[in-house]
């Protein structure tokens, strides 16, 4: 009798967890889609702020997007991330592609790492523009180009948000890719059994 009650309880738990599983997957899919869609306007704004950013100074000349190579890298990474985010959002709702979790996992991981390098490079550029580097005789430029520096700082802030979104997306896609597999067995448990 007692074994029968335990079996009934286990069946109830397993049936309720099976009912909750599609709801959890749907809410995860919605969060994933929202994050991916949020990347697009932030990346486009980063590109626009960086490319249209220019300022002239009568003493030092013109400073624009083409003057600093690291900004071209940031713009390129932003463009790639915006295009990928849009395409992956569309693909997320195509049933035959959703079952292929690796199609999302690998690019999400790669873009998270590439975004990290881009943010690091852009942060260094903004730091050098603000503080300079006396050892290599690079003077700070933000006192001469204040509008340029403030616009670039805003672009960097947006780029950092995109990085955080991609880091979170890489965790979600890793969960999707690896959740079908069983956890590794504990050798201590196997010995006791």
From Swiss-Prot:
A GO cellular component annotated for this chain's UniProt record is: plasma membrane
What S-S linkages are listed for this chain?
A: none
**Hey, which stretches end up on the Cytoplasmic side?**
1-29, 95-109, 173-193
Task: Mark the transmembrane ranges.
Answer: 30-50, 74-94, 110-132, 152-172
Localization, per the record, is:
Cell membrane
The answer to whether the entry has keyword Transferase is no
Q: Cite the InterPro entries for this sequence.
A: CASP/CASPL, CASP_dom
In this entry, the parts of the chain located on the Extracellular side of the membrane are 51-73, 133-151
Membrane topology reported for the UniProt record = Multi-pass membrane protein
Organism domain of life: Eukaryota
Ordered alphabetically, the record's keywords are:
Cell membrane, Membrane, Transmembrane, Transmembrane helix
Q: Where is this region: Disordered?
A: 1-24
The record's principal subcellular location, in a coarse class, is: membrane
Q: How does it assemble?
A: Homodimer and heterodimers.
Q: What protein family is recorded?
A: Belongs to the Casparian strip membrane proteins (CASP) family.
Question: Would you tell me the protein name for this molecule?
Answer: CASP-like protein 2D1
* Native organism taxonomy: Eukaryota, Viridiplantae, Streptophyta, Embryophyta, Tracheophyta
